[in-house]
Amino acid sequence: MLKLKTIRFNAYNTRRNLPADTGRKRGESNFLGAFERYLLSSVYTCGVGGRYFPLSNYGMADFVWLLPAERKANATQGYLHSFETKLHDWRRAFQQAYRYSYFSDASFVVLPPTPGAVAEKYLSLFQTHSVGLWTFDPQASKLNQVFTPEMSAPRNPEAKKKAVQVIASRGNL
């Protein structure tokens, strides 16, 4: 598989659904950008993925990454991680990340430290549903992996196959 490759999924920009004054606020987008840069420079050393990954019936993940699986000759097989970033509303992020667990081997909620501390009080919810909880401080470029679920099969293997096909076609794998 490739070393590191980010791809554009050319998904519909959901910010267009918002009023003009709200649609220009880019806090969450900036947070996601900082998180993506950190992941690609410090966490992942190989794989392919990108921002705003739409999968029909499962929503649009803020960020997905396909990691190569050991001993698998086909580049389209591997481990799929999906991430949902939010600045405040951890409950909404949890709902979305849980939905991504249908096509991902692991899905994560990523929050800034302050809302992350609030979400930590409900850590048992994340553990029960195997949804990861990470906090990220963009100013300090510090990632805290509060809970990382064990790698497991997605809840819907056919949905994963479809997701991997979309990534493979966009990434020319």
Task: Please provide the spans of the model-predicted regions.
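Short, charged, solvent-exposed linker or helix-capping segments at domain edges/interfaces
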Residues: 73-77, 157-160
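Short hydrophobic-acidic sequence motifs that mark active-site Asp/Glu residues
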Residues: 60, 64, 79-84
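Catalytic cores of nucleic-acid endonucleases
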Residues: 80, 85-135
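Non-catalytic C-terminal interaction segments of nucleic acid-processing enzymes
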Residues: 1-11, 16-19, 128-173
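Acidic-basic catalytic patches of nuclease active cores, encompassing PD-(D/E)XK
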Residues: 2-69, 74
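Flexible, glycine-rich phosphate/dinucleotide-binding loops
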Residues: 72, 116, 142
